Amino acid sequence: MNFFRTILFIIILNIPGFAQDYLPSMDYSAMMNIRYYENNGGFLIETVPIFFPPEDMSSVEFEVATSSGETKFKKNVYVNKWQQFPIVDGIRPQGSGNIKLKQAGDFVLRVNVAGKEITRIPFKMSVQNSGDPFNPQSTYTKEGPWSKLGYISVNPERAEDPITFNWWGRIGELPNGKGGMMTVQIMRSGKEVAVSKGSFISKKSWQSASRKLKQSGSNSRNNFTLADLTQNDGTYEVVLKAGDKTIRTYIATVSGGKLQHHPRSAMDYSPHADYITPKVIYNGSGSASNNKMMDAYWVETK
């Protein structure tokens, strides 16, 4: 199946002008998952997938800038060609991808092509000092889309697999302000239809988490699949909890028997820099040869 899909991609991409019909876009989840260091307000940019890469990759660059436009980091990229995905390349900064901001303020993390941003993650940085003159320490925290967005991921080649919910959490959201478990519930008309096991949250800054869903009640051993979710039209609540405390609630919509994508995932969404890719590249092993392209249905807090 994967072989024939790859051949089809190659045939399509050899149609003159096909690749240029779509603007380049970064894997939004991978951008949000760029490694972050609380002790110095720093990032470590490693390989990030780019969809519909431009023909001239020399014009692609990573940048971190202030909201006023002052550049703090800017580098061109190395390109890793992924043969299993002709419409996707992996890119990483040339040289070190290490950035140490060490300052509060409003910033944007973005990728530019020929000087024009194609994907951006705006964020606000704040600093908390320990207040201990004998052990002076600072912790830098960032605020941005991590508190508002999550996504349901589905393997399009395995309809029998459970759906997975992916989100970002931090210990400040937990009842005791320390490390602990977060779980996911899916509710319809006030009734729980699916639930997950817990995911341990241990970081002060935003930590990515994901959990597969099981059916609730007497069918709790059964996977909760995309077909289960879409058998009834309506509004669903994806509830993130820590014990009995509701952390936040995301809204998902099923219409016409299909799970609806976020408005920002429309291919013609404008401004394009705020477009959210409805596909994500998943890798559970660390080897690029094991990358999988998953469907991503992004949801937002109500």
Predicted regions and their residues:
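Initiator methionine at the very start of the polypeptide chain
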Residues: 1, 19-20
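Contiguous segments within soluble domain cores/interaction surfaces
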Residues: 20-112, 117-123, 133-302
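Sec-dependent N-terminal signal peptides
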Residues: 3-16
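Alpha-helical membrane-associated segments of multi-pass integral membrane proteins
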Residues: 126-130
